[in-house]
C-alpha cells in the first residue's frame, strides 16, 4: 500500500479523534484504509438492509429529483462511499474532511494518468447487425458505471465468456477526461455495443462526448433499434425529457409503434438515471419516472435497465401508482418467476461495471433483490411457440457466481 501525505494525515486524524473524541468509531484506521484502497478481500458484501424506498428530496422539484446542477463525483453528500466509513452522526465534519483527503488522493492519481492524453477516434464498436429480424434465440448483456480499472476489465471478460450478441453499457462509461481507456477496455466486445449516455459522458467536455457520438454514429442521444424480435429504446436522462420535448415525442411514438408491431415480442428500455431505487447515494429521478412510467405501462414495456447507483437492484414487476408514485403497485410478489403479458415493468439498476461501490442503506419494499458486487446482467431470449421467455442472470465478477435469477414468460403475439 502506498502512503502519501493525504493518507498519512488521514491516519493521524482518525487516530487522534478515536482517542480523544467523545464520539466513537466502529472501524479501525487500517480498516478504513483497507476499504478505501482495497485489500482484495472485501469486494462488496450483500447488504439487504432494513427497508425504505430511497426517495429523498434532493432536487429540482420532486421528492427525490437529483437535478442536473453539479458534478456527481464532487457532490458534498454525506452518503459518498458509505460502506467505507462508519461514524456517529455528530462526526459529520470529520467525515467530510476524511472524504476530501481520500478523494483528493484518488483524483490526483487520475490526473497523473491523464497528462497530455488526446482523444482518439474509434470505429467499428457499434452493433453491426442492428435491425436483425430473425427468430433465433440470443442473449445480451448490460452494466453501467464501468470506468477503466481492473474491475471493469473483469466485467468485460466475464461478459465476453457468455458470448452476448448485444452489449448495453448504461452510462458513465469513462471517468477520465477522454474515453480512450474505456474504448480500450471494451475492445473484446467490439461490434456488439449500443451505448446509453450518462452524466460524465455528456458533461465532462465536448471532446469525450464527440468520441461517443462519432464512435457509435448516433445523431441523437436517444434512439431505438430492433434485434431478433426485441425492441430496444435508448433514452437520454441528461437531455431535455419533459412533456413537449423532442425526446418525449420520440419516445411516445416509438413505444406506440413497437407495441403494435407483431414482429416484436419484447420491449426493453435503457436509461442512465434510475426511476426506482433502494436507498443509496442517488435517489430516484422522480420527474422522469412520473412522466414515463405511465407510458411504459400503456405500451407494454417489459424491462427497464438503468445505472447511476453503483450497485445492483432488481424490482418486482411494477405499475405506476398515481396516488403515491414512490410506492408503485407490485403486480407479482414472487422473486424469480413471472408469467405475465406486459403486467408490470421490471426495473433493474446495474451500476456494477467496475468504477466503485456506493453501498445500500436498506431495501425498498418494491425491490426483489439487491447486491453490492461488481458484475453484469445477462439476459437470454428464447422465442418459442406459443410462449417466449426472457431470463435475467446477474453474474458476480468474483468467481462468476450467480447472484440473481429471474424469468419472464408470456404468450407471443
Feature annotation, model-predicted:
Residues 380-388:
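A short, structured loop/turn motif at beta-sheet edges
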Residues 105, 109-181, 278:
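N-terminal active-site segment of His-dependent metallophosphoesterases
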Residues 392-403:
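Short, solvent-exposed aromatic-acidic interface loops
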Residues 1-24:
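Classical Sec-dependent N-terminal signal peptides that target proteins to the secretory pathway
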Residues 117-128, 139, 160, 179-263, ...:
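Extended active-site neighborhood of metal-dependent phosphoesterases/phosphodiesterases
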Residues 39-82, 109-111:
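Long, acidic low-complexity intrinsically disordered regions
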Residues 145, 171-172, 198-199, 272, ...:
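Active-site glycine-centered loops adjacent to acidic/histidine catalytic or metal-binding residues
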Residues 27-37, 81-106:
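Alpha-helical segments embedded in low-complexity/disordered contexts
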